[in-house]
Amino acid sequence: MDVFVLDTSVFTNPEIYRTFEEDQRGAMETFIHLALNSRAEFYMPTSVYTEMRKIMDVGELWAEFEMVVKIRSPRRFQLTVPADFLYEFIEELRYRINKGLRIAEEHTREASGCEDVGKLIARLREKYREALRQGILDSKEDVDVLLLAYELDGVLVSADEGLRTWADKIGIKLIDPKNFKNILESLVRHRF
C-alpha cells in the first residue's frame, strides 16, 4: 500500500492546489474524494496540520480531512537518523550563517552613503532571508514532515525545495507535487 506524507504546500501553494481545483476548498474536496477512493494511506504531522488550520478556512471539511489523513507526530525519541545527515546539516547552516554575515557587512558599508535607509534595510532583509532560509529545513514543521516520512518509509508530497532536498539526502521517496492528483487518479483506477 502506498503511504504519502503531506506538507501544507499541497493545499496552500497555488501551483499545487490548482492541479486539483481553482480554489483551496475545491482542491481539498477533490483530494478527499480521491483519497477515499484510493487504497493509499495519508499522513500529516500534528504541527503541520495545526499550521495549516491557521492558514486555511475550510470549515466542516476539516472533519472529512481528518477522516482520510492520519494526523500524528513522528516518534522523535525512537527514530535514528544517519550521523552524516546531521553533520551535513550543520555544515550547511555554518555556510549560510557566514553568507548572511557577508550580506550584512556589504549592506553596512552601503549604509554610510545611503539616503534611504528604509529601502536598504528592506533589501538587506530580503537577501539575508534568501541566504539563510531557501533550500534548507527552516522550521520544526519541516523537520516533522521529514521525520514522519522517514519513519513510515513514505512518499513525501511537498513543494518546499529545502524539505525536498534534505529528504532526498536521507533516501525518502519523493514525487513532483504537481503530479500528485494524477497519481491519486491512477491509484483510484487501478485499486482492484
Curated annotation (Swiss-Prot):
Changing residue 160 to A: Abolishes activity. Signal peptide: none annotated. Keywords: Endonuclease, Hydrolase, Nuclease, tRNA processing. The keyword Nuclease applies. The keyword Transport does not apply. It is an enzyme of class 3 (hydrolase). CDD domains: PIN_VapC-like. Its EC number is 3.1.26.5. SUPFAM superfamilies: PIN domain-like. Changing residue 142 to A: Abolishes activity. GO terms for biological process: tRNA 5'-leader removal. One of its GO terms (molecular function) is ribonuclease P activity. It catalyses: Endonucleolytic cleavage of RNA, removing 5'-extranucleotides from tRNA precursor. RNA-free RNase P that catalyzes the removal of the 5'-leader sequence from pre-tRNA to produce the mature 5'-terminus. PANTHER family: RNA-FREE RIBONUCLEASE P (PTHR41173:SF1), UPF0278 PROTEIN TK1425 (PTHR41173). Belongs to the HARP family. Probably forms homotrimers. This is RNA-free ribonuclease P. It comes from Aquifex aeolicus (strain VF5).
